[in-house]
């Protein structure tokens, strides 16, 4: 009843004449869903929902977080103890981060076990693997931002891993850290990656991933 009233309204007709909203809606709602699809095919969508929650709560926290080695921890404590519902926003961000990684792993397993990576969906699989790497990168960069003991030593260990690579190892370590040792330059780089670079990358590859799924449809059963 409500839908019919909206479609008969003058505003809806005005937009529909110019943007063909009804045709777009029909195309989305009429997409064929194979009968073998079950709840495990929702894991990718749940991962997307977790990312949206991450984006919203992360954006909210940027109003209070200070990417400084002297103020980062204090700003997080202020958010947790002084800001209204700040503890809830940060907690949701942490919980949904763990859930996003878990759902992503289960989604990868589901696609692999059902053969969703095979011809003609190789590119969809490749973009999915790239999205998985970006998701893990979000976790690595975000873990250090509170700049507490756990975050500091985590980033020191992670950024020191490439040092074992012959020839280019030390150069890569300095590139990641921004200097010879972990400090303000490291925190600034990780903050920039976490809040600007990685969100753009994941948005681009998500769009590519969804467009390919939309074009090729859901893979059939084994």
Curated annotation (Swiss-Prot):
CDD domains in alphabetical order: Cytochrome_b_N
Residues where heme c binds: 42
Entry keyword tRNA-binding: no
Classification via HAMAP family: Cytb6_f_cytb6
Cofactor(s) annotated in UniProt: heme b; heme c
Principal place of residence: membrane
Cofactor, free-text remark: Binds 2 heme b groups non-covalently with two histidine residues as axial ligands. Binds one heme group covalently by a single cysteine link with no axial amino acid ligand. This heme was named heme ci.
Stated name of the protein: Cytochrome b6
Family per record: Belongs to the cytochrome b family. PetB subfamily.
InterPro entries according to UniProt: Cyt_b/b6_N, Cyt_B6_PetB, Cytb/b6-like_sf, Cytochrome_b_N_euk/bac, Di-haem_cyt_TM
GO annotation terms (biological process): photosynthesis; respiratory electron transport chain
Example of a GO cellular component annotation carried by this entry: plasma membrane-derived thylakoid membrane
Residue sites binding heme b 1 per the record: 107, 209
Misc note: Heme 1 (or BH or b566) is high-potential and absorbs at about 566 nm, and heme 2 (or BL or b562) is low-potential and absorbs at about 562 nm.
Description of how the protein assembles with itself and partners: The 4 large subunits of the cytochrome b6-f complex are cytochrome b6, subunit IV (17 kDa polypeptide, PetD), cytochrome f and the Rieske protein, while the 4 small subunits are PetG, PetL, PetM and PetN. The complex functions as a dimer.
Name of encoding gene: petB
